[in-house]
């Protein structure tokens, strides 16, 4: 009576326990194959030694092991004959032998990654009685609840999570903490196992913030340097220039990527971007951001509006009159709005009658104001300027400031590459 293991159980040991109420003259126990994996050596029979024939509790722990087969199903028969020759039997039905630890593997997330969700992916090779995903904080923000233990339930203990998905009862992790993750479990025969450790996974559900402090709203912008501040390292990012007014632009939305050095957390007073190759002078844009961090959180929306782009004025600008062709040459300093000026007559590849001076642009007003101070003060000019396209300007000029674009002869200058 009182035998172990129990019927219909999975076991990881060959130990059989019993309780006998009288002395026996002989006894044996037998493992009879009933199903599962084939066992060509079955049945397995072992006679009890003399010290196991006494009344009371006994077990076979001191007897040699049998050559049982993993995942084979057996019926265990205990048989004993008392001193009067009476024979009794006890059957333990449907016992599955399994002394192998389950094979567990965590497949997702990946080590040294960042995630903004609680999806996991894992594999197991047999049904579990207990399964846990354990998150142990190893860096980042503190987590007073570490280690965080996720108990698997239902079908989660029986089948693989081949694709990343959220469990029935997701864990409560701390935003900004970095965890090592491990899968632990016990199968139905109580064999225990642990998986590989997924290291340094950052849980991050905070969206990055990118602040644009240059250019500002309702301003003009020239050059290629912008001023930005980034709250955290970015996986990728781009500045989005969208036409909202002014002259036409062949492309209404420009995505200008941020160079790698500007994807790091920090403040950048002069972040160089390839703007001048994309934007067009005289066009009014709004400036926003399209960026994401390493957990794929998209950046918080930001928009700077009513920015008028002014191209670099460096180079030669030609006005073709009825008889002659006039050329203006601008050599701006670092400000871009003032510098050296030269005008002359274009004769093929040469310039004659050169006159030199300095120039200053004021782009804060419309039309723009161009003041030229020549080495010969009698040649000083004040001009009103409008962009017609990226490479063409309309000019009205005089010794005094013209009242409007209609106050004098309108001349059209065209920029030509060297």
Report the location of each language-model feature:
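Flexible, low-complexity linkers/stalks enriched in Thr/Pro that connect modular domains
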Residues: 1, 82, 91-105, 196-208, ...
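Signal that preferentially marks extracellular ectodomain short beta-strand elements
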Residues: 46-73, 83-84, 154-178, 188-189, ...
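Conserved structural position at the C-terminal beta-strand
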Residues: 78-80, 183-185, 289-291
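Tryptophan-anchored aromatic micro-motifs
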Residues: 310-326, 359, 415
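N-terminal glycine/threonine-rich, aromatic-flanked beta-hairpin/loop signature
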Residues: 321-370
